[in-house]
UniProtKB/Swiss-Prot annotation:
One BP annotation, GO: vasodilation
Function: Potassium channel activated by both membrane depolarization or increase in cytosolic Ca(2+) that mediates export of K(+). It is also activated by the concentration of cytosolic Mg(2+). Its activation dampens the excitatory events that elevate the cytosolic Ca(2+) concentration and/or depolarize the cell membrane. It therefore contributes to repolarization of the membrane potential.
Name by which UniProt lists this protein: Calcium-activated potassium channel subunit alpha-1
Recorded catalytic activity of this chain's protein: K(+)(in) = K(+)(out)
Region of interest: Segment S8: 614-634
Topology, Extracellular side: 1-87, 201-215, 262-265, 323-336, 360-368
Keyword field: Calcium, Cell membrane, Endoplasmic reticulum, Ion channel, Ion transport, Lipoprotein, Magnesium, Membrane, Metal-binding, Palmitate, Phosphoprotein, Potassium, Potassium channel, Potassium transport, Transmembrane, Transmembrane helix, Transport, Voltage-gated channel
Positions with biased composition (Gly residues): 1-26
Biased composition (Basic and acidic residues): 1194-1209
Length: 1209
């Protein structure tokens, strides 16, 4: 028996048995050593354990050579078939019978159903024919049994439908139960696949006891669940045949039945369990059910990966099965021992066509499978792998989410994100003069940044983050935490070809952001003024809560209009809200003084309690002399603190105003630290301090801070130019009641005549037809125009509108008297001007000369050499792709005008005897007379009275140029040219030495105020964020008084509405305006020759309530030798000790003059009531020289006390 034990069959004590056993051992040796070697000894011990077992083995061994079957391992714990016969066919048969049996039943059912339907159809036709033949002879009762049958059938159909619907709900991913079941089935399928990976290390077929094998028990439980889920799917399926042929169904057929067979036979066959890997194909669907995958790229990536991996693992399982089993027709003798993971490796090198040859298929089935697999696998590898790599490589590098930092604000910047727009924004937003900007900037754009922009982000990585996405997508808004952002800033493309489309895009961005979070503060750039009205249609848009729209066209044309009133003002204001560092120049050149002024910016600060009770001019003087600060305005808020609409910005309000607690002041200073002196100033501690740098927080201030505040702060805290302070509303006290026009004005007021718009902010006239204001060239030539504004406009019928109303409105502000209004003459295409006329027909003194600004005949016809200002605009700039050619029309027009030569203009004036008054022009006014426009010598130049850089010589003064010299050459015509491309500024002045790479603000044309580019307005975005009052102040200065209420009115009617002159509307005229003060003559002439700017500042403020804030100086005034150059440059906020020269023009804010509206022909003295005495101001001829006023009181207090009447000349 021991000798016979060498066979795998158990052997016997006889020779034949031993021989049989030997044959069995020989077969066992041909099989894999790792499968059978350890089981041979176990078989021997099993045969010697009992006699009954030995006799049974002996009898079985006799028949084994006849069966010629392979021997499988037999353990002593498992009561297995001692003959060692393979039973793989039983496992496979169970699957095949299930699949084909079910398929046969489905086909049989369909066939019977089809036959039954055909038969019923024929029978139905027969019954119908019988029913027609019988007609009405049959009683109604004969049809009741049929109805009852139909009700029974309907009931049955309803029951089956209910069950089917219930099953569909159970497996549908639309319900929570369905999603749970789908996810659970997928998870259990992966679990079954893991069990297969574990069992793959065992033999392909082995005897196992179900009650002792833990993995088999788990696999059995999984498959029971799969069977139940299969039943639900079968019930819910509409087409049973297609369901039976689905991949998931085939997987169940070849994995579920073999498990039950293995329990019955007490043996396990690895078989086709690897098909569970096909369930991985549904991985992307599972992730979508769980809302993990939301983007198309991520879904596609997971789909490709799941299909590739599942195919790979499934094919490896098949190779593992056939290679470890062998070919059936070879009696399973050509097998080889390969682990599953070696098969995975073999399939990978096969798909990739590498084929190292270290592992290969030996069986015919394996090789045949490899032949077909390499075709499909190679195609899949060649297409799927590159696409997977591309998707992974193209995954959004900036697709994460923003993580808010505790204690640190963040803003979201979106819209037009380019290298230029971002660099300009960051340069101003993160400027060192803003104190410590503890704000993180999050950029959101749907296009990934290029290398240059990416490098810019990396340089500012501590404060800047970029995320790829769109604000129109709520998911992307959630990624950047828009709900917790301090504000959202939307940048516009200033150079786009279609401004209306760009505005529409930004409006859609505002709608999307406001829809996601209505309370977010939004600051957006708009290109066209008329598109601002669409923002008012957004329900959550609220300018009272900080929402602002920066209209570039409105501000650009407003700046240019102010330059028509005081040339150089556009440059000064643009420099004030732009953050620029101080550049020190040692040489005594004009750049030295210009750059000293450029370093000044606009800031706000709450005034110290030491200023309480003082008048505005007194506080202004104290701040300028002692604190070295220039205060130009304060914030006024009515007693109703809950309403922000009652808040106003008062610019140089005059001496009637008394400051109380919590007044917010607007200052011009070089940095934010200097402005804090106004808050820290204490009369008790700092009264004797001469160095303003020593004015810091004192002990008195600390005691005040320790006291509990009486009013809670309400103003929103922002970093940068503003600081937090108790926000008590500044209560303003007037010595006099609300200013009302004098009795003589009220008596002469014609209530039936509308001279102003309904708000009283602008001059108004009845709408005029464009034909009434058109001048022909001959009519214009016969009309002697002088002191007017010539607007050269390039545009055609297809050009985008630039909004000329924004240019005209500041020139028609009601704080000018009618006779002070400059006549405006447009020179350009009549087709274009017709499109703009709808917004211009309510303004007086406007004429049109159809033509082209490049025609010298047209320019001579409008007397361009006698104009106060020539404005060159173009509506065609953004239609050209080449940026260097965008400004070609404006540059050509500018050079054309400068090259013109003019004869003696006095001869031209003689044509006035044969001329006529142009439409809207009142020739009866002395200011409109040709001689007045030519030879006037004003000491103060205001809206209509700015000379063409002409100072007439007087004894003791150095005349730089004469009248005829100025008029003979076009180079002396004052003009301002709008540019799109900053670098094109180099072409405006042929005699300057500006480098092409010089920044715009450092170039001579910009410093002189003869060029303006819209790019300078980019700084307003960050300035508005840090202090929303800055935008209000700038708009008040440049628009002539436009308010949100007026914008709402224009949005309704797209035109100004005329209003009657009432005391309330006339009171709105009482507001400050910009003027230029000449030092050649007048009361300040003594200071013009070597005097100090500080003395001029104090004298103008005390005497005339005029607030000086800058100088417009000749470029070569610092030279000791005379120069013929008449170019001037801007000096902003010079220091107290700054030396003046006689040719300087002083920028000042002057009060409204109520008496200038009376007849200018009379030079007699006039007196007014006390209401107007506090509002005395000066116009062109209103300030006499000091020598002519011997009775003038010595002190301002005595003048106020005596209420002495002003003398007008």
């Amino acid at each position: 028996m021991a000798n016979g034990g060498g066979g795998g069959g158990g052997g016997s004590s006889g020779s034949s048995g031993g021989g049989g056993g030997g044959g069995g051992g020989e077969t066992a040796l041909r099989m894999s050593s790792n499968i059978h070697a350890n089981h041979l000894s176990l078989d021997a011990s099993s045969s010697s354990s009992s006699s009954s077992s030995s006799s049974s083995s002996s009898s079985s061994s006799v028949h084994e050579p006849k069966m010629d079957a392979l021997i499988i391992p037999v353990t002593m714990e498992v009561p297995c078939d001692s003959r060692g016969q393979r039973m793989w066919w039983a496992f496979l048969a169970s699957s095949m019978v299930t699949f084909f049996g079910g398929l046969f039943i489905i086909l049989l059912w369909r066939t019977l159903k089809y036959l039954w339907t055909v038969c019923c159809h024929c029978g139905g036709k027969t019954k119908e024919a019988q029913k027609i033949n019988n007609g009405s002879s049959q009683a109604d009762g004969t049809l009741k049994p049929v109805d009852e049958k139909e009700e029974v059938v309907a009931a049955e159909v309803g029951w089956m439908t209910s069950v089917k619907d219930w099953a569909g709900v159970m497996i549908s991913a639309q319900t929570l139960t369905g999603r749970v079941l789908v996810v659970l089935v997928f998870a259990l399928s992966i679990g079954a696949l893991v069990i297969y990976f574990i069992d793959s290390s065992n033999p392909i077929e082995s005897c196992q006891n179900f009650y002792k094998d833990f993995t088999l028990q788990i696999d059995m439980a999984f498959n029971v669940f799969f069977l139940l889920y299969f039943g639900l799917r079968f019930i819910a399926a509409n087409d049973k045949l297609w369901f039976w042929l689905e991949v998931n169904s085939v997987v169940d057929f070849f994995t579920v039945p073999p498990v039950f067979v293995s329990v019955y036979l007490n043996r396990s066959w690895l078989g086709l369990r690897f098909l569970r890997a096909l369930r991985l194909i549904q991985f992307s669907e599972i992730l979508q059910f769980l809302n993990i995958l939301k983007t198309s790229n991520s879904i596609k990536l997971v789909n490709l990966l799941s299909i590739f991996i599942s195919t790979w693992l499934t094919a490896a399982g098949f190779i593992h099965l056939v290679e470890n089993s062998g070919d059936p027709w070879e009696n399973f003798q050509n097998n080889q021992a390969l682990t599953y993971w070696e098969c995975v490796y073999l399939l990978m090198v096969t798909m990739s066509t590498v084929g190292y040859g270290d592992v290969y298929a030996k069986t015919t089935l394996g090789r045949l499978f490899m032949v077909f697999f390499i075709l499909g696998g190679l195609a899949m590898f060649a297409s799927y792998v590159p696409e997977i790599i591309e998707l992974i490589g193209n995954r959004k590098k900036y697709g994460g989410s923003y993580s808010a930092v505790s204690g640190r604000k963040h803003i979201v910047v979106c819209g037009h994100i380019t290298l230029e727009s971002v660099s300009n924004f960051l340069k101003d937003f993160l400027h060192k003069d803003r104190d410590d900007v503890n704000v993180e900037i999050v950029f959101l754009h749907n296009i990934s940044p290029n290398l240059e922009l990416e490098a810019l982000f990396k340089r500012h990585f501590t404060q800047v983050e970029f995320y790829q996405g769109s604000v129109l997508n709520p998911h992307d808004l959630a990624r950047v935490k828009i709900e917790s952002a301090d504000a959202c800033l939307i940048l516009a493309n200033k150079y786009c070809a279609d401004p209306d489309a760009e505005d529409a895009s930004n409006i859609m961005r505002v709608i999307s952001i406001k829809n996601y979070h209505p309370k977010i503060r939004i600051i957006t750039q708009m290109l066209q003024y008329h598109n601002k009205a669409h923002l008012l249609n957004i329900p959550s848009w609220n300018w009272k809560e900080g929402d602002d729209a920066i209209c570039l066209a409105e501000l650009k044309l407003g700046f240019i209009a102010q330059s028509c009133l005081a040339q150089g003002l556009s440059t000064m204001l643009a420099n004030l809200f732009s953050m620029r560092s101080f550049i020190k120049i040692e040489e005594d050149t004009w750049q030295k003084y210009y750059l000293e002024g450029v370093s000044n910016e606009m800031y706000t600060e709450y005034l110290s309690s030491a200023f309480v009770g003082l008048s505005f001019p007194t506080v202004c003087e104290l701040c300028f002399v002692k604190l070295k600060l220039l205060m130009i305005a304060i914030e006024y808020k009515s007693a109703n603190r809950e309403s922000r609409s009652r808040k106003r910005i008062l610019i140089n309000p005059g001496n009637h105003l008394k400051i109380q607690e919590g007044t917010l002041g607007f200052f011009i200073a070089s940095d934010a630290k200097e402005v804090k002196r106004a808050f820290f100033y204490c009369k008790a501690c700092h009264d004797d301090v001469t160095d303003p740098k020593r004015i810091k927080k004192c002990g008195c201030r600390r005691l005040e801070d320790e006291q509990p505040p009486t009013l809670s702060p309400k103003k929103k805290q922002r970093n940068g130019g503003m600081r937090n302070s108790p926000n008590t509303s500044p209560k303003l006290m007037r010595h006099d009641p609300l200013l009302i026009p004098g009795n003589d004005q009220i008596d002469n007021m014609d209530s039936n005549v509308k001279k102003y718009d309904s708000t009283g902010m602008f001059h108004w006239c009845a709408p005029k037809e464009i034909e009434k204001v058109i001048l022909t060239r001959s009519e214009a030539a016969m009309t002697v125009l002088s002191g007017h504004v010539v607007v050269c406009i390039f545009g055609d019928v297809s050009s985008a509108l630039i909004g000329l109303r924004n240019l005209v409105m500041p020139l028609r502000a009601s704080n000018f008297h009618y006779h002070e209004l400059k006549h405006i003459v447009f020179v350009g295409s009549i087709e274009y001007l017709k499109r703009e006329w709808e917004t211009l027909h309510n303004f007086p003194k406007v004429s049109i000369l159809p033509g082209t600004p490049l025609s010298r005949a047209d320019l001579r016809a409008v007397n361009i050499n006698l104009c106060d200002m020539c404005v060159i605009l173009s509506a065609n700039q953004n239609n050209i792709d080449d940026t260097s050619l965008q400004d070609k029309e404006c540059i050509l027009a500018s050079l054309n005008i400068k090259s013109m030569q003019f004869d003696d203009s006095i001869g031209v004036l003689q044509a006035n005897s044969q001329g006529f008054t142009p439409p809207g022009m009142d020739r009866s006014s002395p200011d409109n007379s040709p001689v007045h426009g030519m030879l006037r010598q004003p000491s103060i130049t205001t809206g209509v009275n700015i000379p063409i850089i002409t100072e007439l010589a007087k004894p003791g003064k150095l005349p730089l140029v004469s009248v005829n010299q100025e008029k003979n050459s076009g180079t002396h015509i004052l003009m301002i040219t709008e540019l799109v491309n900053d670098t094109n500024v180099q072409f405006l002045d042929q005699d300057d030495d500006d480098d092409p790479d010089t920044e715009l603000y450092l170039t001579q044309p910009f410093a002189c105020g003869t060029a303006f580019a819209v790019s300078v307005l980019d700084s307003l975005m960050s300035a508005t964020y840090f202090n929303d009052n800055i935008l209000t102040l700038i708009r008040t200065l440049v628009t002539g008084g436009a308010t949100p209420e007026l914008e709402a009115l224009i949005a309704e009617e797209n035109a100004l509405r005329g209003g009657y002159s009432t005391p309330q509307t006339l009171a709105n005229r009482d507001r400050c305006r910009v003027a230029q003060l000449a030092l050649l003559d007048g009361p300040f002439a003594d200071l013009g020759d070597g005097g100090c700017y500080g003395d001029l500042f104090c004298k103008a403020l005390k005497t005339y309530n005029m607030l000086c804030f800058g100088i417009y100086r000749l470029r070569d005034a610092h030279l000791s030798t005379p120069s013929q150059c008449t170019k001037r440059y801007v000096i902003t906020n010079p220091p107290y000790e700054f030396e003046l020269v006689p040719t300087d023009l002083i920028f000042c804010l002057m009060q409204f003059d109520h008496n200038a509206g009376q007849s200018r022909a009379s030079l007699s003295h006039s007196s007014h009531s006390s209401q107007s005495s506090s509002k005395k101001s000066s116009s062109v001829h209103s300030i006499p020289s000091t020598a002519n006023r011997p009775n003038r009181p010595k002190s301002r207090e005595s003048r106020d006390k005596q209420k002495k009447e002003m003398v007008y000349r």
